[in-house]
Regions:
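Short acidic, gly/pro-rich beta-turn/loop elements at beta-sheet edges
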Residues: 31, 162, 183
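Solvent-exposed, flexible loop/coil residues
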Residues: 20, 123, 165-166, 191
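Short, cysteine/histidine-rich loop/knuckle motifs that typically chelate Zn2+
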Residues: 151-156, 175-177
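Short helix-coil boundary/hinge micro-motifs
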Residues: 1-151, 158-159, 196-199
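Residue-level signal for short amphipathic helical patches enriched in basic/charged
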Residues: 144-147, 164, 179
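Basic DNA-binding region of bZIP-type proteins
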Residues: 177-194
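Histidine-centered nuclease catalytic patch
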Residues: 158-166
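Cysteine-rich micro-motifs
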Residues: 168-179
Length: 199
């Protein structure tokens, strides 16, 4: 779950979002097979949520995190994963993600250096940290990078990743693992099917 992304691979405005989406580990192949469900949830306790935010400089060590904060964070993460999943399929196959709103996480425009406007969270604490993540999504959307945040098509992976393909049609978090496993399975099915038809 702490698979860190090399800095040059994901644009800065979606790096934090990508890490947040991957606090849920749905991989079930290889070393991940048989992993207990509670270990798949990186935000399984208020303490784990606090540690995740503190580790990324989004929260001070003195901030107390409770179960309601954790549930809010999981809800935001799951909604963003659903939106990234919508980015992963052709437009004609998408479910409508419109209508989601996070009214309890206000964002404000602040003018920083050289009167440059910035979108920032209007609160502190956990809500402020979540607001920062949502602000990054808005910035990424304006730069065209949010549409490249996807969920791996491999049902035994479901890792969130940034699609680097020129055509923006990547399906796998890594071709050398998930893509190759898919191609191998497809080849074996095809081979079995042709052997069955011949016999």
């Amino acid at each position: 779950m702490e698979r860190r992304i090399p800095e040059g691979e994901v644009p800065e405005e979606v790096r934090l979002v990508n890490e947040f989406l991957n606090t849920l580990d749905l991989e079930t192949y290889g070393e991940h097979a048989g992993k207990p469900d509670e270990e798949r949830e990186g935000l399984r306790s208020p303490e784990r949520l606090r540690a995740w935010f503190v580790g990324r400089g989004l929260l001070g060590r003195e901030v107390v995190v409770n179960e309601a904060d954790r549930q809010l964070a999981v809800g935001v993460r799951d909604a963003l994963r659903s939106a990234a999943l919508a980015n992963s399929v052709p437009a004609r196959e998408r479910s409508d993600a419109a209508g989601w709103s996070f009214q309890e996480l206000p964002l404000v425009v602040r003018f920083g250096e050289n009167s440059k406007p910035e979108l920032v969270s209007g609160e502190g604490g956990v809500r402020g940290a979540l607001g920062r993540i949502l602000a990054d999504v808005v910035v990424a959307s304006s730069k065209g990078t949010w549409a490249r945040m996807k969920i791996c098509a491999a049902q035994d992976c479901r890792w969130a990743y940034y699609d680097h393909s020129k055509s923006r049609t990547g399906r796998w978090c890594a071709m050398e693992t998930c893509g190759n496993r898919h191609k191998t399975r497809r080849y074996r099915r095809k081979k079995r099917s042709s052997a069955w038809q011949e016999g």
